[in-house]
Design a protein with these regions (language model features):
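Sec-exported extracytoplasmic/periplasmic mature domains
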Residues: 335-346, 494, 498, 534, ...
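Conserved catalytic/binding loops enriched for acidic/polar residues
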Residues: 474-479, 504-902
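Stable alpha-helical elements in mature extracytoplasmic
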Residues: 326-333, 480, 484, 488, ...
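The catalytic-center signature of Zn2+-dependent metalloproteases
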Residues: 354-374, 482-538
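Auxiliary tRNA-acceptor-end handling modules of aminoacyl-tRNA synthetases
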Residues: 31-322, 340, 344, 349, ...
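Sec/Tat signal peptide C-region and signal peptidase I cleavage site
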Residues: 27-29
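Bacterial N-terminal signal peptides that target proteins for export
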Residues: 1-14
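Bacterial N-terminal signal peptides
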Residues: 12-24
């Protein structure tokens, strides 16, 4: 059908000569150390104006493009004043173009950041089609296919249509038959839909214009200065006047590759991003999905050699914006992946080059993969890649580091919110999936940055207090560069196609992590694709490296699966060899769990962010001990006078306090995941040494976790800080653009501590966890011990409501209350949760409902007994608290007259 739309004499001899010459030209910067071999045609260059023709269409062509600057390239362009025209020969009609969109210059807010790619996992494939006297811009449907020429392919054509985005009038015809169109109706619009990130703004065509335009033999690069207008009522700190917000958008357009690349089938045991398609020519019993991993095309220069350089290496350019002091650490992190590629058969698969200070290419160019350093003030790092949506071949990748990534003292540590606490511990019920770089609708940026900054702040605080003389500049630099190398390795892994593996840090013991001989030879975590915390041990314990920046066995295995050359030449022909590689998944060091295994309610207690070691309880105890050691010294160390005699800032004390509190809370939350836990495995039946898909955490381990939480999370002792400390937790006193006002200048002690307690309590009493505890009783053989729902409720009540039965005889005063204020807050929260479960507040678990109602009845009986004791003279606050609790419980019991009984 497309052929019928094309003119029979599409190309003149002159055009054929031009195309041959263009195709013979080298790819810009393909394999050479020089920045760019293919010289772009530029509107600012010395290209000659287009010539006019004698025929009528050619005369129109000559008039239209008189004095225009021609930019020969993949798509010939003509720039004239504020107009930009494209000349589409018939040979380009029906071809598939890959369109990459990115932000060349942003506003430093709302994800509109310079260097940011647009449309993660939703890359555009366009066609230009001639319909009558117009050219249509069509976005292709690429997810559904069938074998060409088969009956199923006809059915697919009937079932799924492409999307016609634009229809542009043909303005003129060139002497060679090319169709000239104005590109403004296509690109001088809100094509990337950025207005969605700017509520109250709309695209302002009258204030938008073309920026830099470049044309190469293999791609064209278009920049648009897109202005979005508003009434000015909205304030954006980084924009001088919100009545006009200008964002520089870059479009990189190239032909979708037609090369020797062989897609590789994905396997759920190995963590790659995938390109998922539906093949309707398959005869299958299950779904019709064909899943290819996302990876680069690597071919051996010498196919017979066991280890050979690639024909074309993966080249990353360190952008000239990267500070000199950090370039060696970044280079080390990127080049470290060559160890894995060598074991897959490639020598020097990845090359790192430094962008010169003066160069004529841009980082957004599809021909260049870059490590970019930006200053958006949002403190993040990310490593997205752009792939051929038909094959999974990675075509372009850029690692982006924000300069504030290394700013580990942050104002948000001054006061926490339930939302910020949830973000540090895997999200909450109903939160969107935290799938870094995963595909449409997935989180566009790797969320490593927030936790890494907190971990660095923890290390700086702990070392300042525990190390004699405080944290030296040398140790501080070591801490930062070790962490920077590890993060560079992590983000580079994403650009190679790898997903997160949150089981990486859970194999070895804490003792192994602190044995530098082991970590410097064999690494620490089994994968750098985990979120690895800083390794800081309590004073008096053996201390290893802060970060172990080495690839782990999982990383090497994953690269083998994705990149090892295999015989066959077709995806299905590789299946047998791929199965041999993936079949090793039962080896403990190759365990894999990713984002969707590590969210709120997920069962595996060994799949965590920022955990360290094989024992979550040991790690939680170590963190609790560290916090207890460091907390008393933070005022002296964080606000002490510096060597110049200048006074310290109290907000640093408050920030350090917040970091320590969150360190304690996060570790306890991870330990709480043992309760109702199931250790998961992605291994397939028949894999060597493979565990079953689920293994119930032993009752003894679950009880150990509950005992730990009773003391370290629900007890008052961990939060019994000195009054002097509380009175020195001052907030930042600056108030101007770029700063946020805290809710309270003094520290909201009760609120923040209760937020962390509620986070753990919410986990333990979550309907999904309660359902698993009940289900697990059936998953454990009858002759083995199991933690029951009844025991869980009983243990929680004893931990949280201990004073009901354990208040000793005596007289209590307001300064020495029977129940302190922190415990009173926790008890109110617990009773509220029990009440909600008893009233069947969406649990769907009748056993939990009955047990919660039973606990409330027991509490009423205990409260009656305590309030009636003559030898226990309660102070007014504790008595009022207990009376109020009883009244609340009775309202629940009275309202639910038919509440079940255990």
């Amino acid at each position: 059908m497309l052929a019928s739309l094309c003119r029979p004499r599409a190309c003149s001899a002159a055009l054929i000569v031009f195309l041959v010459a263009a195709c013979a030209g080298p790819l810009a910067g393909a394999d050479d150390a020089s920045p760019a071999k293919a010289e772009p045609a530029s509107a600012a260059g010395d290209a000659k104006p287009a010539a006019a023709s004698a025929s009528a269409p050619q005369a129109a062509y000559g008039v239209l493009l008189k004095d225009a600057t021609k930019l020969p390239g993949l798509i010939p362009l003509h720039r004239k004043d504020d107009k930009l025209y494209a000349e589409l020969s018939d040979s380009l009609l029906g071809k598939e173009f890959f369109v990459l969109t990115s932000i060349a210059r942003g506003i430093g807010e709302r994800s509109l950041l310079g260097g940011m790619s647009i449309g993660f996992g939703d890359d555009w494939v366009w066609q230009f089609r001639k319909v009558d006297d117009t050219i249509q811009v069509v976005r292709r449907s690429v997810r559904f296919f069938a074998a060409q020429g088969s009956p199923e392919s006809k059915a697919v054509d009937l079932a799924y249509t492409d999307s016609v985005l634009f229809s542009v009038k043909i303005a003129a015809t060139s002497p060679s038959g090319g169709h000239v169109i104005d590109l403004a109706p296509i690109f001088l619009t809100d094509l990337p839909r950025l207005a969605a990130s700017l509520p109250g703004f709309s695209f302002a065509r009258d204030r938008s214009n073309w920026g830099r335009i470049k044309a190469f033999p293999d791609n064209v690069e278009l920049e648009v200065a897109a202005t979005y207008g508003s009434s000015g009522a909205t304030t954006i700190d980084t924009v001088p006047d919100t009545r006009g917000v200008t964002i520089i958008i870059r479009y990189s357009i190239s032909l979708l590759p037609q090369n020797s690349y062989v897609p590789r089938l994905a396997d759920d045991r190995v963590g790659y991003f995938v390109t998922a398609l539906k093949d309707f020519s398959q005869q299958v019993e299950e779904d019709r999905f064909v899943r290819y991993i996302n990876r680069w095309q690597l071919e051996k220069a010498d196919p017979k050699a066991a280890i050979s350089p690639p024909k074309k290496p993966i080249v990353f350019w360190i952008e000239k914006t990267v500070p000199f002091r950090y370039r060696p650490a970044i280079r080390k992190g990127i080049e470290s992946w060559n160890e894995a590629f060598e074991k897959a058969g490639f020598a020097n698969a990845i090359e790192v080059r430094q962008q010169p200070d003066v160069t004529d290419w841009d980082p957004e160019d599809v021909n260049y993969n870059t490590f970019r350093w930006i200053t958006s003030g949002q403190g993040f790092a990310m490593g997205p890649s752009r792939v051929n949506p038909r094959t999974g071949q990675i075509l372009d990748a850029d690692i982006i580091f924000d300069a504030d990534f290394l700013q580990f003292w942050r104002r948000e540590y001054e006061t926490f919110t339930p939302q910020s606490i949830a973000a540090l511990t895997g999200g909450g019920p109903g939160d969107p999936p935290l799938v870094g770089h995963g595909g449409p609708g997935c989180c566009p940026a790797c969320s490593l940055f927030a936790g890494h900054a907190r971990e660095t702040a923890l290390a700086a605080t702990a070392l300042a207090v525990n190390v004699p003389g405080g944290l030296s500049e040398e140790e501080k630099e070591k801490l930062v560069t070790q962490g920077l190398t590890l993060v560079a390795m992590h983000e580079l892994g994403h650009t190679l196609g790898l997903r997160h593996n949150f089981k990486g840090s859970a194999l070895k013991s804490l003792a192994d992590y602190n044995d530098v001989e082991k970590t410097r030879t064999s690494g620490g975590s089994t994968s750098v694709m985990d979120y690895i915390p800083v390794n800081i041990m309590p004073k008096g314990k053996t201390q290893g490296d802060y970060y172990s920046a080495r690839l782990g066995p999982y990383d090497i295995w994953a690269i083998e699966y994705g990149y090892k050359p295999l015989a066959g030449g077709k995806p299905e022909a590789e299946r047998k060899e791929l199965e041999k590689i993936a079949g090793r998944s039962g080896e403990p060091e190759l365990a894999y769990a990713t984002d969707e295994d590590t969210q709120w309610g997920d069962p595996d207690p060994h799949s965590n962010r920022f955990d360290l070691g094989s024992d979550p309880i040991e790690f939680a105890r170590a963190r609790a001990e560290l916090v207890a050691q460091v907390m008393p010294g933070i005022v002296e160390r964080m606000a002490g006078r510096d060597e110049d005699g200048d006074g310290g800032r109290y907000e640093r004390v408050r920030q350090a306090f917040g970091v320590l509190l969150s360190t304690h809370g996060s570790a306890m939350y991870n330990a709480s995941r043992l309760v109702g836990g199931l250790v998961g495995s992605r291994s397939h039946r028949g894999d060597a040494n493979a565990p079953p898909p689920f293994t119930v955490v032993t009752a003894a381990r679950q009880r150990e976790a509950l005992d730990l939480l009773a003391v370290e999370m629900f007890g008052s002792k961990p939060f019994s800080f000195s009054p002097e400390l509380y009175n020195q937790l001052a907030s930042s006193r600056w108030m101007h653009w770029g700063t946020d006002e805290v809710d309270r200048e003094d520290y909201p002690v009760h609120d923040v501590i209760l937020m962390w307690q509620n986070r753990v309590l919410s986990r333990l009493l979550d309907p999904l966890v309660l359902a698993r505890v009940r289900d697990n009783e059936l998953k454990v053989p009858a002759d083995q011990d199991s933690l029951s729902l009844a025991e869980l409720f009983e243990r929680l009540s004893k931990a949280v409501m201990a004073e009901v039965e354990g208040t000793a005889a005596g007289e209590y005063t307001p300064r020495k209350p029977a129940i302190d204020s922190l415990r009173r807050s926790l008890q109110r929260s617990y009773v509220t949760r029990l009440s909600a479960i008893a009233m069947a507040g969406g649990t769907g678990n009748s056993d939990a409902q009955a047990l919660a109602a039973g606990e409330l009845r027991k509490l009423v009986a205990g409260l009656d007994t305590l309030l009636a004791k003559e030898d226990v003279k309660l102070e007014p606050m504790s008595r009022a608290h207990l009376v109020e609790l009883r009244a609340r419980i009775m309202k629940v019991l009275d309202a639910g007259i038919d509440l079940p009984r255990p």
